[in-house]
Amino acid sequence: MIFEQIVLDFSGLVEAARDNSVLEAIFLSLYTGFLATLISFILGVPAAYILARKDFIGKRIVESILDIPVVVPHTVAGIALLTIFGANGLIGAPLDSIVQFRDALPGIVVAMLFVSAPYLTNSAREGFQNIDPRMENAARSLGAPLWKAFLFITFPLASRHLLIGSIMCWARAISEFGAVIMLAYYPMVGPTLIYERFTSMGLSESRPIAVLLILVTLTIFVILRLISSGWRRYDRD
């Protein structure tokens, strides 16, 4: 019985790997997760630097707001995003003629971005906080502008935290389900397709897709972790 189940699972996995709709959904998960991570990096790194280096009124409130996506239920996050980015939403309505978020790729990216950005921002902030600001000040006293001191001193020293934060951000983005289906059920990403197959066809049809998604993401995750570990050894040397 056990051997028969293994054979059935393997054959189902091979069949899933040949299914274009499955491959498209998994690729879309990886692609939109990458876009969400890229946007998180572009917006989150400057925000993390400001939070690590500057004191201002309301700083703790800003930090708390940035952490809201980590603790709020993701269906609630999806409803909030739908209210803002839907066709009649605060942002979705004015931009409806330019870009649509409801059941569209931008909506998937927005949902992933919302739930994953705090992981990168918090990791980057920790990295910047661990760097002695006197190193930047020394570079600036020698005539280096702020952007140059950041690019050639602060950024390399915080690179490991930035890489780890990016990995966690990407992993969190591609695993998101609740917020994504509320804002953009279509086009289907991997988790949405698994849910669709499970509710319509049962466990036997959804399990191979889940296993395939795990294998693909785990492989990429291990590679990124190995790069991070190698980076750590390089820094120590």
PLM regions with names:
Residues M1-D9, R18-Q129, I153, L157-G178, ...:
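Membrane-water interface segments at the C-terminal ends of transmembrane alpha-helices
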Residues L142-G143, P156:
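Glycine/proline-centered hinge or cleavage motifs at structural transition points of membrane proteins
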Residues R125-E136, L146:
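Membrane-helix/interface signature in polytopic inner-membrane proteins
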Residues M188-V189:
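Extracytoplasmic catalytic/substrate-binding loops of multi-pass membrane glycan-assembly enzymes
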Residues A139:
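The alpha-helix within a helix-turn-helix
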Residues I57, P145-L146:
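Short coil/turn motifs that cap or connect alpha-helices
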